[in-house]
Amino acid sequence: MQLETQDALYVALELVIAALAVAGNVLVCAAVGASSALQTPTNYFLVSLATADVAVGLFAIPFAITISLGFCTDFHSCLFLACFVLVLTQSSIFSLLAVAVDRYLAIRVPLRYKGLVTGTRARGIIAVLWVLAFGIGLTPFLGWNSKDRATSNCTEPGDGITNKSCCPVKCLFENVVPMSYMVYFNFFGCVLPPLLIMMVIYIKIFMVACKQLQHMELMEHSRTTLQREIHAAKSLAMIVGIFALCWLPVHAINCITLFHPALAKDKPKWVMNVAILLSHANSVVNPIVYAYRNRDFRYSFHRIISRYVLCQTDTKGGSGQAGGQSTFSLSL
């Protein structure tokens, strides 16, 4: 099958995003595994996020490419490809929310934080979030799908009897997953609420940090702390902004498709392609925002790349610069 120019460009960009997502997030997982200083509850959530983003690069993006080309297959195989994409992206969203809640607890109740957020509890929360992601992503298999419409023209040769079980359909996302599910359940129920909650949490974090800083005497140490907290607040605001930038366009298009089908019918194909690329690109920037701006992660990245990529001998001892208290300090 020969690809049109814009389809070929879309596939090429998706493959680049997939490669970057896998490389960056594997590096995050390796850094946590290699450094005892990074093995904290906060970073367990980051590893969950990185794992979801690795899976986006390895599976979700190839599946998205496959269903964008519209090849013919049976309905449930196509539905599985579409739903698996939803499972992984939903897991990534939940992991982002878990990190936000974890950071709020760390700054709101610092003295009780270690007792509240233990490694065992963090792993349990991660397991629950993945189960929820699978439940949400696979909901169309319970009947909320477009099987009747997609297989309405299927008949057995000669007798005219409808046979929907083995009917080949053109495997496009909108042919198997109804927009009502994507808008009402996925967007309004599972994407928009976490986004709004994260915005509120990060605003709260900023307010608590500012309130604490107002009670500090501006000595040299206090000035350094103030600069670090301001930098952290800016980084947290950037997290919310990138999340919205990456995810809202594709859901906005879905809303237009559902509520204004006549308008959506004439939309250029490249518009949806760009929106999908943006949503997948979130898996690339997550390691940059959450990990690359952390001093301990950078040190561990340097060691891993030097030893296993550049094959250089490690001449420095130790496991990093910091301990558990500054696990997610965003200072540079």
Curated annotation (Swiss-Prot):
Protein's cellular compartments: Cell membrane
Cystine pairings recorded for this chain: C78-C171
InterPro entries given in the database record: Adeno_A2B_rcpt, Adenosn_rcpt, GPCR_Rhodpsn, GPCR_Rhodpsn_7TM
Keywords from the UniProt entry: Cell membrane, Disulfide bond, G-protein coupled receptor, Glycoprotein, Lipoprotein, Membrane, Palmitate, Receptor, Transducer, Transmembrane, Transmembrane helix
Lineage top rank: taxon: Eukaryota
Predominant cellular place of this UniProt entry's protein: membrane
Entry membrane topology: Multi-pass membrane protein
Topological region Cytoplasmic: 34-43, 102-121, 204-235, 292-332
Lipid attachment, kind S-palmitoyl cysteine: C311
Annotated adenosine binding sites: E174, N254, S279, H280
Ranges per topology, Extracellular: 1-8, 68-78, 145-178, 260-267
SMART domains for the chain: 7TM_GPCR_Srsx
A single GO molecular function term of this UniProt record: G protein-coupled adenosine receptor activity
GO cellular component, one term: synapse
Stretches that traverse the bilayer: 9-33, 44-67, 79-101, 122-144, 179-203, 236-259, 268-291
Residues modified by glycosylation: N153, N163
Gene Ontology terms describing biological process: adenylate cyclase-activating G protein-coupled receptor signaling pathway; cGMP-mediated signaling; G protein-coupled adenosine receptor signaling pathway; mast cell degranulation; negative regulation of cell population proliferation; negative regulation of collagen biosynthetic process; positive regulation of cAMP/PKA signal transduction; positive regulation of catecholamine secretion
Function: Receptor for adenosine. The activity of this receptor is mediated by G proteins which activate adenylyl cyclase.
PANTHER family: ADENOSINE RECEPTOR A2B, OLFACTORY RECEPTOR AND ADENOSINE RECEPTOR
Family membership: Belongs to the G-protein coupled receptor 1 family.
Designated name of the protein: Adenosine receptor A2b
Record organism: Rattus norvegicus
Gene it is expressed from: Adora2b
